[in-house]
Amino acid sequence: FIAEVYNPQLYRDYIYRGHFDYLYDKVGLYDKLKAVSAGWCSAKEITSCWQSVEDIQEHMLNFLENHDEQRIASDFFAGDALKGRPMLLVSALMNTNPMMIYFGQELGERGMDSEGFSGEDGRTTIFDYWTVDTIRRWRNGGKFDGALLTDAEKKLRDYYAQVLDMS
C-alpha cells in the first residue's frame, strides 16, 4: 500500500494513521538527487534528506523514475542513462528501505516518443496503447531474454542487477 505525499509534515500521519506501508520519497531524496545531478546543489544536501525521515526510513520508497517523472535518459533530465548511475547507488544503497525500478529504467528507456495524449515530454505514457521499444526488444517475442537489446542496454541492465544485489 503506497502513498504519494508531497507534504513531508504529513508523512507520519499517512504511515501511522493511514496505515500505508510505503511513501514515495519524492520531495526528499528524489528531488535532491535530481538537483545534485543537474548541478543545482551540493551532494552534501543529501544528508538532510535521510535525517528528516530517519525514524520512518523503512517506510520510504526510493525511486528515480515513475509514471509522473521524466526519464533519466530523456533530453529533459540527464540525457544519458549512464548519468543516473550515481543516483542509483545512493538511492539503492544509502538505507535498507525498498527501491523501485520503473518500466525499462534499467534499460535506459528515454521516454522521448511523441505518443498519444502526452507528446514528447521525457515520460513514458501510461494511458495509451503504445509499444515502448526497449521493453519490446527485451521481451523478444515472449522469450524475455533481452537478445534484441543493444550492448549498452545489456550493460546498463547488468549494472542495475549488480547494484540491486548489493542492496
Residue ranges and their predicted role:
Residues 7, 31-34, 44-47, 54-66, ...:
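Loop/helix patches that line or flank the sugar-binding groove of alpha-linked glycan CAZymes
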Residues 12-15, 112-114:
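A short acidic (Asp/Glu
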Residues 11-14, 30-38:
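Short, charged, surface-exposed secondary-structure boundary motifs
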Residues 22-29, 46-48:
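A polyampholytic, Gly/Pro-enriched intrinsically disordered region
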Residues 1-11, 24:
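Aromatic-lined carbohydrate-recognition surfaces of secreted/lumenal glycan-active proteins
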Residues 17-22, 118-119:
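Short, hinge-like loop/turn segments at secondary-structure boundaries
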